[in-house]
UniProtKB/Swiss-Prot annotation:
DNA-binding region: 20-39
NCBIfam families reported for this sequence: TranRegGlpR_Halo
Function, in words: Transcriptional repressor of genes encoding both fructose and glucose metabolic enzymes such as phosphofructokinase (PFK) or 2-keto-3-deoxy-D-gluconate kinase (KDGK) during growth on glycerol. Required for the glycerol-mediated repression of pfkB-specific transcripts, but not needed for the high-levels of the pfkB-specific transcript present when cells are grown on fructose.
Reported induction: Expression is repressed by glycerol but highly up-regulated in the presence of fructose or glucose, regardless of glycerol supplementation.
Lineage: Archaea, Methanobacteriati, Methanobacteriota, Stenosarchaea group, Halobacteria
The species this protein was found in: Haloferax volcanii (strain ATCC 29605 / DSM 3757 / JCM 8879 / NBRC 14742 / NCIMB 2012 / VKM B-1768 / DS2) (Halobacterium volcanii)
Protein name: HTH-type transcriptional regulator GlpR
Domain HTH deoR-type as annotated: residue spans: 3-58
Superkingdom: Archaea
Entry-linked Pfam families: DeoRC, HTH_DeoR
Record-annotated disulphide pairs: none
Length: 255
């Protein structure tokens, strides 16, 4: 395993749990504790994890927002499995909005490059991915947030208020039965709120780590979601609560 791949796996393992010890990471990856400690120091310097006594913990909290780069390396297998299922919702001639985010980016990578949809997004990175070959793509315009690479602000909001979409692929930082869908940033929350409002069908694409978490600003209730696609398997209580809000749940897609 190359050093870059080893470090990516460390971030993934730490982020997918409440934390990992040096010993656990060493056993899992097959490298010495000294190597793991050096990697953790470097990853903390890059803002990808936080070191704790004897190991490392994720950097997330209610008011704290991970960067695009931090999220990009987390649970890639799960995100790709979600994307495989998500593109089954596409139909010829649709106008499809892709929310800015790392899971929606994986969905964009799976979209057929045959020009059968019109893609719209507030993510310049995602627009480049969609624009390969024959697909037509429109950007919202607006101010680019450095942390998440998402376009926000009055120009982006004005675009949203004048447009409508057949389908929305929506991401979230957190999903909680009581709080609904939440995100750390108010400008992004407003954009997501408009996406949901203007879409005929809302497909939430989020890995199971988002469930049971709350962030700073609510942008949608569960009742506004039509379909929830996730990698892991929901427990019976969570499934019942989400489905009782009228949401169709497709879980366990990474099995």
């Amino acid at each position: 395993m190359l050093p870059a791949e080893r470090k990516r796996r460390i971030v993934e393992l730490v982020s997918d749990s409440d934390g990992r010890s040096v010993e656990s990471l060493s056993d899992h990856l097959g490298y010495s504790k000294a190597t793991i400690r050096r990697d953790l120091r470097e990853l903390e310097d890059r803002g990808l994890i936080e070191r704790s006594h004897g190991g490392a913990v994720p950097v997330t909290s209610v008011g704290r927002e991970q960067t695009y780069g931090q999220k990009e390396v987390q649970n890639l297998e799960g995100k790709r499995a979600i994307a495989d299922r998500a593109v089954e919702e596409l139909a010829e001639g649709q106008v499809v909005f892709f929310d800015a985010g790392t899971t929606t980016m994986e969905v964009a990578r799976k979209v057929p490059k045959d020009g059968t949809i019109l893609g719209v997004t507030n993510s310049p990175r995602l627009a480049i991915e969609l624009n390969e070959e024959d697909n037509e793509v429109k950007l919202t315009g607006g101010t680019l947030r450095r942390r998440t690479k998402a376009l926000v602000g009055p120009t982006a909001e004005s675009f949203m208020e004048r447009t409508n979409f057949d389908l929305l692929f929506l991401g979230t930082n957190a999903l909680d039965v009581e709080s609904g869908l939440t995100t750390p940033n108010e400008d992004e929350a407003r954009m997501k709120e408009l996406m949901v409002e203007k879409a005929a069908k809302v497909v939430l694409v989020a890995d199971l780590s988002k469930l049971g978490r709350r962030s700073f600003v609510q942008f949608a209730s569960l009742e506004e979601i039509d379909l929830f696609i996730t990698d892991g398997t929901l427990d019976a209580d969570s499934r019942e609560e989400i489905e009782s809000a009228g949401v169709t749940v497709v879980d366990g897609v990474a099995r």
